[in-house]
Amino acid sequence: MAEKKLIAILQRHGSTLLNENNSFRSRMDPPLDKQGISQAEKAAENILNEGFKVKKIISSPLLRAVQTADIIADELGLDVEQNRGLISWDLGFLSGKNKDEYDEILNYFVDNPKSKVPEGESLDDLEARTFEFFNEEMKNDDLKVYVTHTSNVITVENLIHGNHDGRPESGETSVEPGGTVGVYVDSEGKYSTEVLFGVEEDATFGS
């Protein structure tokens, strides 16, 4: 079996009230709730105790991600850099809507990745900026923690597996709020992901 190296840590932000309400978060900007703060603190503890040689923490500019990143940064003694390359998929008019009630509408835009969500962006837009961001990031070997959102984690998975048809139905890795996913590359140049910490859940867009 080819040896593999951890090259990136994808950290999902902690939970917010909108998570509890089963709403599409997208570009809405709620703070972490009490559970979300605890999840971020646990993630920070896990990353520290594992002894990962983290050089930098980069966060989506949305508050829930920045708060998560700040908690981890305090534990690791690092600063946080914000980058819009990690911001959530802009779901436009779907933002704040209940997932169960609007799931079929979201799936239309997932199944038709070139179609822009009204007042938002297309899935292709999300994939393009995610690829551009990580393509630039992978030009150096520093291990970094990227604090981001479910849709971004799924998009990284899709890029790794060459799945460009939208639906995350190929066994992609996703975790509950506060969970941590590792991105690896082996000696043959093959990329993979695995859950480092947290509870795995079905991968669904819209977080």
Language-model features and meaning:
Residues S59-S60, A128, V147-T148:
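Short beta-strand scaffold positions
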Residues A8, N140-S151:
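Generic beta-sheet signal
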Residues G51-G85, N107, N158-H161, Y184-S207:
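Conserved histidine-centered catalytic loops in small-molecule metabolism enzymes
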Residues H164-T193:
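Domain-level recognition of soluble alpha/beta enzyme cores
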Residues E50-K53, E137-L143:
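Glycine-rich phosphate-binding loop signature in dinucleotide/nucleotide-binding domains
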Residues P31, D74-F131, G206:
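Phosphate-handling substructures
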